[in-house]
């Protein structure tokens, strides 16, 4: 089985510790037409700011066209072609209007023992990104680099290692030009209840600072999941998510600084409806 892409390394742990948490209020409505067009409208309020987004997606065999407009007058168009000329190869073309320098062409290739991702900006002095993962589903190593052709400098070079078995995933990342080391693990404790625990330790060598975060999740029933996390700075978060119909979810999350409970409590609400 393919090892996946570089962004897949440590993804299970990141989803456990960060996905669906939030202190904002968000409403999302999705509807699908008989012609295969998916329309999604979303509104988000955080503090005093309100952000809106309207997305239209059309799928036709191997071609997907995605057009997204937001309340900041940005228009993002993404065209994706699966199996682009050969099995395992995907091409992605994206452009944000009115930013004329935002165009980007990306190629993704998945092989039994490798996952390659390459992208280049569509402008006169493009940024070139290249990442690769080599190995198997059980053991893989990866690199991720970015080169700025305008300055002829490498702006990013990261490396990662992943170990996976049936219920345990461990990963190690070296980021920020070798300044940040991140170790993480994910353990699926009980399959039938989707009970899992995980942790992430991040250390900055230049600042000599470390951040440690623990998290867990458990399914109360097939439609209801609870999650919790806590870090070494005393920040605690929890959420409950309920799916009352397929892909329609309500999520209530909270965050508190245990060192200043009376001042720091925040509550977020997310409602996703799919028709």
Swiss-Prot record:
GO cellular component, one term: mitochondrial outer membrane
Subcellular location: Mitochondrion outer membrane
GO terms of molecular function: porin activity; voltage-gated monoatomic anion channel activity
InterPro entries: Porin_dom_sf, Porin_Euk, Porin_Euk/Tom40
Tissues expressing this chain: Highly expressed in flowers and at lower levels in roots and leaves.
Stated induction or repression of this protein's expression: Not induced by osmotic stress.
Alphabetized UniProt keyword annotations: Ion transport, Membrane, Mitochondrion, Mitochondrion outer membrane, Porin, Transmembrane, Transmembrane beta strand, Transport
CDD domains xrefs: Porin3_VDAC
Protein family: Belongs to the eukaryotic mitochondrial porin (TC 1.B.8.1) family.
Function recorded in the entry: Forms a channel through the mitochondrial outer membrane that allows diffusion of small hydrophilic molecules. The channel adopts an open conformation at low or zero membrane potential and a closed conformation at potentials above 30-40 mV. The open state has a weak anion selectivity whereas the closed state is cation-selective.
Notes on the domains: Consists mainly of membrane-spanning sided beta-sheets.
Name the UniProt record assigns to this protein: Mitochondrial outer membrane protein porin 3
Organism: Oryza sativa subsp. japonica
């Amino acid at each position: 089985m393919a090892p996946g892409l570089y962004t897949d390394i440590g993804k299970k742990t990141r989803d456990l510790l960060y996905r669906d948490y939030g202190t904002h209020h968000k409403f999302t409505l999705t509807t699908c037409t008989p012609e295969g067009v998916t329309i999604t409208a979303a509104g988000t309020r955080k503090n005093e700011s309100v952000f809106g987004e309207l997305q239209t997606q059309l799928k036709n065999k191997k071609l997907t066209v995605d057009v997204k407009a937001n309340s900041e007058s940005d228009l993002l168009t993404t065209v994706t072609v699966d199996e682009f000329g050969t099995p395992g190869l995907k091409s992605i073309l994206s452009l944000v209007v009115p930013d004329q320098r935002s165009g980007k062409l990306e190629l993704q290739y998945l092989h039994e023992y490798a996952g390659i991702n390459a992208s280049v900006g569509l402008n006169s002095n493009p940024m070139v990104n290249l990442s690769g993962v080599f190995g198997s589903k059980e053991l893989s190593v990866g690199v991720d680099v970015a080169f700025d052709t305008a300055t002829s400098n490498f702006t990013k070079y990261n490396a990662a290692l992943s170990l996976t078995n049936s219920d345990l995933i461990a990963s190690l990342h070296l980021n920020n030009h070798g300044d940040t080391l991140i170790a993480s693990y994910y353990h699926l404790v009980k399959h039938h209840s989707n009970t899992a625990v995980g942790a992430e330790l991040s250390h900055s060598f230049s600042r000599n600072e470390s951040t440690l975060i623990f998290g867990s999740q458990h399914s109360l029933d097939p439609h209801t999941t609870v999650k919790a996390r806590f870090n070494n700075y005393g920040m605690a978060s929890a959420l409950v998510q309920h799916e009352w119909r397929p892909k329609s979810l309500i999520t209530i999350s909270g965050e508190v600084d245990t060192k200043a409970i009376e001042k720091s409590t925040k509550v977020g609400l997310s409602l996703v409806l799919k028709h």
